[in-house]
Amino acid sequence: MRIVRGKWAGRDLTSPNDFRVHPTAERVRAAVLDLLSPDLKNASVLDLFAGTGALGLEALSRGAKRADFVETRPASLHALKANVAALRVRDCTRVFKRDALPFAGALTTAGAYDICFCDPPYESRMLDRVIEGWQVTHFARVFVAEHAPGHELPRGGKRFEYGETVVTIYRAPKPPKVVPTEPTPSA
């Protein structure tokens, strides 16, 4: 596994020897980050269920400003920290050894992040719970969900299929424009 594009293109990433970890395939990662290209410059990124950190690190390679990673599995955390160290990005990353559900649930500020990647184990329904929370708070302007083809998500996202992997991208609604009104003269 390696970084596909950007300033670290071709750099290898460490991956844990754990059958429960399914890193996002390079071609899927490349396609998704290409779709997000206009959103990446100076973006703050959240990588939930981060695993190796490949999605967040790819975003940094392509111009994101900072990335936070949330992961609980020891083997994945070890690989993630090794990848952060190898790319020398400790100054613009934070690694949280936390459960992603309560972490995301604690995010109450709209737009706390520009982009959120969410890639929980396919067999779980944790993604549904994170999306429910995101739909209430919109803690990221763009929410990227990776899931199995048979996992139906709420409407409102744009769905992209890559074989046995589906990526659905949601965008937070833009706040209404406030148009200043001219003051009316008093009589």
Where are the regions that the model predicts?
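Class I S-adenosyl-L-methionine-dependent methyltransferase catalytic core
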Residues: 1-187
